[in-house]
Amino acid sequence: RYHRAAAGQLLGGVARLPYDGYLGSSVDTADYLDHLLSDPSSGVDAPAAVIVETVQGEGGLNVAGTEWLQKVAAIARKHRALLIVDDIQVGVGRTDSFFSFEAAGLRPDIVTMAKSISGYGLPMALVLIDRQLDRWEPGEHNGTFRGNCHAFVTARAALEQFWRTDSLVASVRAKGNLLKSRLEQIAQKYDPSRASTKGRGMMRGIDLKSGEVAGQVISKAFKRGLIVETSGPKDEVVKCLPPLVIGE
């Protein structure tokens, strides 16, 4: 029965709105969101939830400002919508703190997590839900990354090993600054209008403004034994996400 019902909501029921800074520094897209939801003639229905990444992973390493995130959270509450933070790529220390939204002081109703949460690269995904919102029956939510017993063991081991103290956070912060500095040195060798750094923590990259150029960079890197991805709407950002425990 649950399999046939799927998620209960079609993808067409999602409205996508511009991220922080997308329309330039003079336009606050959080205010735009509030205006759309406050105006019955906007064409945007009242949402069940607002979903946001604090740093856009596949979107091109765009970093949302703290004030913008706080405003979006307040707007969600104002319009009686849940706040969902997608921490799949940016959580578990990738941006230094365990949850990427800690610095902004957010309290999401739902948090999605995966990838690094297993600790050792095993398939695992979690959905953290406020107990008052949990209405799922046993077995109702399933998928290929759910219920992997091996991953549960490694995830617990990783949490106990790396998150008992704040040492990993301090290490990620220091190495993130080092990574930023090195990438800035690379970008400065070229025309600033053609190369600039982006990201936060150990989730950094260089925006080359061209998917073709970025593709050439990762191709040459691969030939030299280094696997690097691209992201952004035109694959124009060379994306560097090294292991959190990598040496300096």
Where are these regions (language model features)?
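Conserved N-terminal phosphate-binding loop of PLP-dependent enzymes in the Aspartate aminotransferase
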Residues: 1-248
